[in-house]
Amino acid sequence: IPGFFEPFKGADVYRAEDIPPLDVLLITHDHYDHLDYPTIAAIRSRVKRVVCPLGVGAHFEAWGYDPERITETVWYESVRLAPNLELTCLPSQHFSGRTMTMNTTLWAGFMFDIAGYKLYLSGDGGYGPHFKAVRDMCGRIDFAVLEDGQYNKEWSDIHLMPADWKLALTDIAPAVVMPCHNAKYALSRHVWTEPLTAALDNARSVRIPVTTPLIGSRIALADPAAAGKIWWPEKP
């Protein structure tokens, strides 16, 4: 986001041309760090289908995407993407908006049910009762992608502080967790490695395996924790 929020040094080596063809492009909300116009435009011919919260599809239509390829969802709505793949839109405690708009589109987390294998994407958001509600609604969660970066006490309602990340992790109790939202854009004042280190410590303290793969690497769902290792420096 030129002039406002820049990537951490070295975090922009993965570019649009590196993104492979996508069966489904899933967007959690329309903030610039999640919905980047140059990237979305560059991969348009490689995206078979877009799934996003209510209202976000208008951006894609304005940027030349076929409306027939766009599926908008609301909280607790499920969409079957394939015979053995169902996606459910779930609440998060966040907000939405771009330059001239605020909260005119929905924000969300999502649960993938892949033939009984449950993969949870929290989306952006602060701590709230929705985490336990997700667990109660969906049962066992095999893999969770849980946001853990760009936090600050001044906006703890919309991003998880490390202590709240641990609470959320305990609520959803996944078999394996992958922290995200931590090492791309400098939206807060912490050093870029701090969220990763805190997540690793917090996950270990509650005995939940944590995986921290490098961008672009593949994760085997049969053994997702195998992809994790400490690749960041102790002192950035």
Residue ranges and their predicted role:
Residues 39-46, 113-119:
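Short, surface-exposed connector motifs at secondary-structure boundaries
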